[in-house]
Regions:
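Acidic, polar ligand-binding/catalytic clefts
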Residues: 2-68, 141-146
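Extended ligand-binding regions for polar small-molecule ligands
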Residues: 1, 60, 72-73, 78-80, ...
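A local structural motif
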Residues: 1-9, 87-99, 112
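Periplasmic-binding protein-like
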Residues: 48-56, 128-167, 187-197
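Ligand-binding clefts/hinges and TM-proximal coupling segments of bilobed small-molecule sensing domains
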Residues: 83-98, 134-137, 168-197
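A ligand-binding cleft/hinge motif common to bilobed small-molecule-binding domains
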Residues: 14, 31-39, 85-88, 114-147, ...
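Bilobed "Venus flytrap"/periplasmic-binding protein-like clamshell domains
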Residues: 32, 53-105, 120-122
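Alpha-to-beta junction loops
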Residues: 2-4, 10, 20-29, 73, ...
Length: 197
């Protein structure tokens, strides 16, 4: 695309408002393209797929089911699809909402959260570091009602030309092999979810 970019780090819940008020031009933050979000913004074609992964302390008996989390503390990123999912699926859980995944992870390490739920890539990273050494993955989901069409770049609805340019750039890196090269360098599995075809 040959465009100069400047990155802004924002709290998750401030991303869509920042886009809609022209503080940023795109959201490139592993945001799922969901019907709810499409009510206020547009998305590029998906560029990867990332299911949600449940993580618990090793040896814990907590299960990611409505009955399994009854009365238990589930930690999620506030205003995320993971928050929406556990709010709908686990009505009897004590849902703790955090402004960052790092805060949620720290609460689990401190024993204040029984079950974490976040995207698989983030949780895999947590499990591979010292802070996650006493934790284990206990299940994943990619329920399309909550996870939508995949991870895409968010743009304002009226920015059709920018969306088309971004789609062309995504298509080019998939066709020229750059996407696969990055995938293979950083991930142990194919994150494309079929988006590289």
């Amino acid at each position: 695309m040959k465009r100069e970019c400047r990155f802004e780090q924002l709290d998750w819940e401030g991303l869509i408002p920042a886009l809609k008020t022209n503080k940023v031009d795109v959201i490139l933050a592993s945001m799922n393209d969901t019907p709810e979000r499409r009510e206020s913004i547009a998305f590029t074609d998906p560029y990867y797929s990332n299911p949600g992964l449940f993580v618990r302390a090793a040896g814990s008996k907590v299960e990611p089911t409505a009955e399994g989390v009854k009365g238990k503390v589930v930690g999620v990123l506030r205003a995320s699809i993971f928050d929406n999912y556990v709010t709908a699926k686990f009505p009897d859980a004590d849902i703790q909402r955090f402004t960052s995944q790092e805060d949620a992870n720290a609460a689990a390490v401190a024993g204040r959260v029984d079950l974490l739920f976040a995207d698989k890539i983030v949780m895999d990273g947590f499990l591979q570091h010292d802070e996650g050494k006493n934790f284990e993955a206990v299940g994943e989901t990619d329920d399309p009602e909550y996870f939508g069409a995949g991870i895409a770049i968010g743009v304002r609805k009226e920015d059709n030309a920018l969306r088309e340019d971004l789609n062309a750039a995504l298509k080019a890196i998939k066709e020229n092999g750059a996407y696969k090269k990055v995938n293979d360098k950083y991930f142990k599995y194919d994150i494309s979810g079929g988006t590289t075809q």
